[in-house]
């Protein structure tokens, strides 16, 4: 299968993707935990080369997973200008399992450097070029960097792009669905849809099932949002692609797996062994064949046959050998590498490090309370993530307006990330109370922020509080007259 041929057939230049694909392949291999050029090796034992596979601690996957959990989890809350809009948006997100999808999208995007959330309309009916949106729904999906092909971009990011989806068939052929998001002369987005069949020999044939080849969105809002780590691409300063969160830490990942593999070998090669002479054997009375007096599946024993034991054990039939394991040295080396990795990836040196006595790691709260590097890293990544989420929300609203199903109030878009482990909320709330008392912060803003609701809802809540306060004062006044 050669997607480059498909793109060339459509008049696009795939060179940007082709030149970048070697880095994607490298990061994918480390994300999976097995880089063939590093983890597969040979060692000469004095007789022949023995093929070996190096053990992997799978740290690259762990980095991306942990950062995704810190950035987007169940505590992230999105509110719009009014309560009704917030409910509509939340339903669209819930229908698409967005919380799980976004968390996984961030993990994969941080692994490969780039990812894309794509929005579409599903379940539409087309009758003689008339589109019926009555039963349509907003569809949110994720496309990884291997299937993203930038068409135009500037310093603010990708403006036009093509994405590819594959459906494999049992006969070895594949259905390739190509979508291109292009700006037309009116600077509105047109989505071009094409479907191809690719056979085993990479022959590409366009299928006739390509209704709505050109779909006008009638908006300048892109129906896609790029997700990338907020890290400058130092491999190619002019590339539209982002780089993996561990792109500049490959050598550290190698060092970690070298130590981890050595630790495993140390334990494996240094295990207890019992060497036994032929006197430890007994012979089958029927066949005369030698048999072991101990469990034949026990790999602790090694029979020497006619050889004799050495040194003080030469008159014995069994000699015990115990290797000296260098566990402490390996753990110290591993810990040093993990500290370097934490610093290189923005987690801080203590995040992945462990106590060499208890082998326990610190919690995120403990790490952040002692080191603000992770705090700054999360806040840095949240800048791009918030921008992507706002684009997704605007795209959802664009689809709602196009289909006539809903219109969101985008006068206010609040994205409240889970900062509970990286900020002193009590201190921040205390400061806001002081501002409130000094009339430098409005009650509505205070209620909106700390209740996690829109300003419209906060205004209603403030009025309820005022009404209740007035009612209570009236009761106290009447009670005073009675007394």
What are these regions (language model features)?
Residues 78-83, 88, 283-285, 307-428, ...:
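Surface-exposed loop-to-helix/strand elements on domain peripheries
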Residues 433-483:
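Activation/maturation switch segments at domain boundaries
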Residues 104-106, 119-122, 268-276, 351-356, ...:
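Short coil/turn segments at secondary-structure boundaries
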Residues 111, 116-243:
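Extended, regular secondary-structure scaffolds
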Residues 97, 346, 451-452:
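Glycine-centered helix-boundary capping/hinge motifs
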Residues 1-159, 483:
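Extended, helix-rich architectural segments
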Residues 210-369:
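Extended, charged amphipathic alpha-helical segments
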